[in-house]
Amino acid sequence: LQSKENLTASFEKFGIKAVMIGNTTKNVDLNIGKLRLSIPSMRKIWMATSSKLESYQTKKPLATIRAENIIKQPLKFNFPKKFNGKKPIPKQNNIKAAVVREKGSNSEREMAYMMDLSGFIVRDVHMTDLIEGRENLEDIDLLVAVGGFSNSDVLGSAKGWAGAFKYNPKAKSAIENFFQRPDTLSLGVCNGCQLFIELGLITPNHKKQPKMLHNDSGKFECIFTAVTIKTSNAIILNGLEGSTLGIWAAHGEGKFSFPQKEIKYQIPAKYLYSEYPSNPNGSDYNAAMLASEDGRHLVMMPHLERTIFPWNWGHYPDNRSDEVSPWVMVFENAYNWLANKS
């Protein structure tokens, strides 16, 4: 067991004999008596079999690059200055948000919880609700399209989902009217990102639209990585500029492919390292997110809703005692902007 407390004394109180066999240091060596072992070298040996197996699954030379970068891409975090680590204060409100999903979507419950935490009245909207006209989004202020594998990705990621909007008049009218309103916000995460990109909702004035392509590795990637948030016009990222935060990414077609130069796009966040596996998909310009020109609409491949609490993270700074992670600021920003508008 590893603990900051004196566990030996605690065990002895209950008559259990315990012996301390070592202590941690800041060095990257393992010392056992006169034996000195380099932890990075031992880790490389330990991972050799996995790396060999991965070479048969992953497009070359990314399996080798992963093995080389495993010690070159340490997680580094820089938290927002305005973040206090406290849960948002409950609000009395009438600001309505919707989580839109399709057959095969997931993480809608985590997303709804995160939105509710910031004060939104959250409604669950399935595509059948939009197609049949039970929902039209007219009273919705914030629309969030969630992740998953809509229609099992049979036609490609979000292709079928986008088709459900394009070729069903009521659903098409609902989404178009929502995005034409000047007082709304939206977020597309993972499959939702692929959806909004496929529909051309983030860069509507571009003749050539961005595309979401298969990961460079040629396989599904799931990794706890980190993104650095840049200064941008993205409304819901206000106050997060300059921060580097941990986040889960899990997708098979997460590569942003941009037909124009970077200056033509609003890219508010990039992966901490541009190389694989920190950038799990090989996105152009190392992009992790993309925002509309006016900053009201944002898409991202990583899953912020899977990093709500410190214990959701693959690693969280041990010198902090936060109740929630900085990602809750996203929906706090959304709520505040909409509240001021109303």
Q: Which residues are covered by each model-predicted region?
A:
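Generic beta-strand/beta-sheet core signal
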Residues: L1-Q2, V19-T24, G33, V100-E102, ...
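Beta-strand->loop->alpha-helix junctions that form or flank phosphate-binding loops
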Residues: S10-R36, R123-D129, P210-K219, K270-L272
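Amide-donor transfer/coupling interface in amidating biosynthetic enzymes
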Residues: I21, R134-E135, E176-N177, Q209-S342
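Residues that mark the start of a beta-strand
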Residues: N94-K96, I121, G246
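Short helix-loop-beta junction
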Residues: R109-D124
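Short acidic/histidine-rich motifs immediately flanking catalytic phosphotransfer sites
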Residues: N136-V144
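Cysteine-nucleophile active-site neighborhood
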Residues: F149-A234
